């Protein structure tokens, strides 16, 4: 007789394993699961584990040709969310072998690629990931990190100051360069291309790069300080992006910029490697993040996107401002700011940190407070972010 019955089987028979002891090499995920009415939470959690690892909707004969026990994701714990009806945190452990080394792209394709459209779930949110050292060690991480950046800039013991050039679209390259010069000459450390400044008809990228480089050198000569302008290398193809980064390097400027979510993790990791090889700092903007992280019960929390960026590589990343927001936001924001900067971060549910994260020796990323802040926010910002941050006005 055949060794299995055809037909749809309950996932929880195979993928819900409450007695499982997680391994130090497992990637652990915390999902906020909202099952459809009538679907038990164990089945919903197991469905997530199955569909994001080895499972499919039925048993197939090729299952016998591999070791499911070795390769399957396991839902090992489920807890109800306090104050929410029919919402659960499902903890899933993935064996390390399911993931390609050094690829954030593959990690996300596996963990969040398919499960979010699942019929048994009303909504699903990835709240946190625990990246084991065995996996994080396969990534280069940030091109330089906080300490090396301070050494390159010769600026210590204070937050770095920057601003975004406005109006963000419509200036000619020459006038744009003028604005950069005035800001840097006036005392800022950095100026920034807006995230939507790429290479538009009114200002092509190469013209902007040349005028900004001129502004940087002039301001440096007059102030005796090292200055920078985040030249946005984001482009329509990754080859064009690398070409723009190479041009920035030839001009001798210290830093380039990338929109990592719209540009994609594959392009970002390539650019990050190039930046380390060529001594460029890399500023990361998170355009499109709110599409993914704004809903409370569906999507991916920004702390996961921040962890992914630290692995893919970036020296700065925009991380919200806290100022003027609700107090609760403050703890959660500081939670992922610590995840960006520190080596070792303890589990702390009050700050939204579901797992203890050990980055071992991976360099840190400077959090950038940007968007709607002005000089009156200064005391609050320095108190919240401390010295290792970039405060960007305008």
Swiss-Prot record:
The record marks 325 as: Transition state stabilizer. Substrate binds at residues 114, 164, 168, 286, 318, 370. It catalyses: 2 (2R)-3-phosphoglycerate + 2 H(+) = D-ribulose 1,5-bisphosphate + CO2 + H2O; D-ribulose 1,5-bisphosphate + O2 = 2-phosphoglycolate + (2R)-3-phosphoglycerate + 2 H(+). Binds 1 Mg(2+) ion per subunit. InterPro entries: RuBisCO, RuBisCo_large_chain_AS, RuBisCO_lsu_C, RuBisCO_lsu_C_sf, RuBisCO_lsu_fd_N, RuBisCO_lsu_N_sf. One of its GO terms (biological process) is photorespiration. Heterohexadecamer of 8 large chains and 8 small chains. This is Ribulose bisphosphate carboxylase large chain. It comes from Cabomba caroliniana. The lineage of its organism: Eukaryota, Viridiplantae, Streptophyta, Embryophyta, Tracheophyta. The gene is rbcL.
